[in-house]
Amino acid sequence: IRPGDKVAILAEGSNAWIISELGLFYAGAISVPLSVKLEESNDLLFRLRHAEVKAVFVSKYQLPKIRRIRAELPQLEQVIVLGHIPLESGETAYGTLKRLVRDYLSKNREEFLKIGQAIQNDDYATITYTSGTTSDPKGVILTHRNYTANVEQALSRVDIPPYYRTLIILPLDHCFAHVVGFYIMIACGASVATVQIGATPMETLKNIPQNIREVKPHFLLSVPALAKNFRKGIESSIRAKGKFTEGLFHRALRTAYAYNRDGYSKGSGWRILLKPFVALFDAVLFRKIREAFGGSLKFFVGGGALLDAELQRFYYAIGIPMFQGYGLSEATPVISTNSPKYHWHR
């Protein structure tokens, strides 16, 4: 892999995914992150051809897709497989690659580091493809400076102390997960974890609650559908505790809604009288809900679709505000967001 080469990543989110992309950047290569939802017949084949991909990092679960179309990709020279699975000709195990890299660096470290140091702001970092719902997908080219600038802009709105942890639940192929999921964490010296991959997508989803309790994240990325599922889980758990607890929970929500109002006017005017009741409900109910998220969760960052105001009020009431970001891939992607200091959910 040489500077300027395009290398795809087709894998479920994992630490190895992040390490692979950072390794590509050090080598001066261009990352082409791809969604695991792509089917090989059209969508995947088009992207690999259009981007002129020379190598691909692929998980063992996605490998069959590559095998079925490899004969149609004469430019594809290397297939690096994440996970343990019997390999075919022309495929290299991720573990083998790591050993080869260690051996190479033991003799050529300075020469290799010069490649990364020579990268310029306007050099391409990633090519991210749009969905292509009305025509062929478009490759959005983002430079290294696009990413670093958006990281700086994001950190002007939200403080990330070095002790913060996050668990990335969303797919890593989108630049939202890149910037808000791990690049701002790297910039601040904070910690990133990824969900334990299951044999099926459903098994991976089932790992999320346990992984949250293990990691004890300080913030989580979300999309409205995921936030709604979390809320359904919370309300289902409350109902299971009986009518009294359910009634108390709804009274607590109404009180918190009245106290918080639209967020920015929290506790204003006569609402200050509700503060002791909100504190009581927090101690009795809401704190226990937060413990199910690991006990350290400060906020969510939402994106990807319109976030319902009622959903924002709900999470603000239980003590885990959900900040709504807006952006687009071409903007790397964050354009605007509310934040702890500027929170309004009208």
Report each predicted region and the residues it spans:
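Conserved AMP-binding/adenylate-forming
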Residues: I1-L38, I169
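Structural core segment of the AMP-binding/adenylate-forming
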Residues: Y26-L100
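Conserved pre-ATP/AMP-binding loop-to-beta segment of ANL
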Residues: V81, K98-Y129, D136, D159-R165
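Conserved AMP-binding/adenylation subdomain of ANL enzymes
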Residues: T148-R165, L172-K275, A279-A283
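ATP-dependent adenylate-forming carboxylate-activation enzymes
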Residues: A11-E12, A29-F46, K60-K65, V192-E214, ...
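Conserved AMP-binding A3 loop
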Residues: A125-V151
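Conserved ATP-binding loop and adjacent catalytic segment of the adenylate-forming AMP-binding
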Residues: A193-Q196, L273-P276, G295-G302, L307-R346
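Short hydrophobic alpha-helices that are characteristic scaffold elements of the AMP-binding
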Residues: E21-A27, H50, I186-A187, Y316
